[in-house]
Amino acid sequence: MQGLIQRVKHAKVEINNQVVGEIGQGILVLLGVEKQDDEQAADKLLHKISNYRIFTDENDKMNLSLKDIAGELLVVSQFTLAANTKKGMRPSFSSAATPSQANELYEYFVAQAKALNLTVAAGEFGADMQVSLCNDGPVTFNLAV
């Protein structure tokens, strides 16, 4: 499972010009689910994202987590993160989870984030979405478990 995380001032996701998820300061995570992933992988990634220290403290050092700043989380599914791009001029998605498995784990990830009492917004699995964000820094990390 991969989470491409971006520290944001604000972010939103729209479907057909309708905002379906929006956050203020926090993390936008683009979530990619692979065949071998399970709930344990989702839990591990969520723990890492919510505790990853990418927000600055009073000394301007990356020392605070999403939980520390009471930040918000926007989760957007993105199967293209599971692409193999090492060969050729076209990505291969052979390692991506099936849509049903990916949807199940995506929904599980969102539910578990809400259970942590985080402020959570989410896109819609499988939808054609437009994501807008103000990347703060920019600060972007690809976390894989």
Curated annotation (Swiss-Prot):
An aminoacyl-tRNA editing enzyme that deacylates mischarged D-aminoacyl-tRNAs. Also deacylates mischarged glycyl-tRNA(Ala), protecting cells against glycine mischarging by AlaRS. Acts via tRNA-based rather than protein-based catalysis; rejects L-amino acids rather than detecting D-amino acids in the active site. By recycling D-aminoacyl-tRNA to D-amino acids and free tRNA molecules, this enzyme counteracts the toxicity associated with the formation of D-aminoacyl-tRNA entities in vivo and helps enforce protein L-homochirality. It comes from the Bacteria. It is found in: Cytoplasm. SUPFAM superfamilies: DTD-like. Belongs to the DTD family. The keyword Transmembrane does not apply. Its EC number is 3.1.1.96. NCBIfam families: D-aminoacyl-tRNA deacylase. A Gly-cisPro motif from one monomer fits into the active site of the other monomer to allow specific chiral rejection of L-amino acids. Keywords: Cytoplasm, Hydrolase, RNA-binding, tRNA-binding. It catalyses: glycyl-tRNA(Ala) + H2O = tRNA(Ala) + glycine + H(+); a D-aminoacyl-tRNA + H2O = a tRNA + a D-alpha-amino acid + H(+). The lineage of its organism: Bacteria, Pseudomonadati, Pseudomonadota, Gammaproteobacteria, Alteromonadales. This is D-aminoacyl-tRNA deacylase. CDD domains: Dtyr_deacylase. One of its GO terms (cellular component) is cytoplasm. GO terms for biological process: D-amino acid catabolic process. A motif (Gly-cisPro motif, important for rejection of L-amino acids) lies at residues 137-138. Homodimer. Its main location: cytoplasm. GO terms for molecular function: D-tyrosyl-tRNA(Tyr) deacylase activity; Gly-tRNA(Ala) deacylase activity; Ser(Gly)-tRNA(Ala) hydrolase activity; tRNA binding. Coiled coil: none annotated. Pfam families: Tyr_Deacylase. It is an enzyme of class 3 (hydrolase).
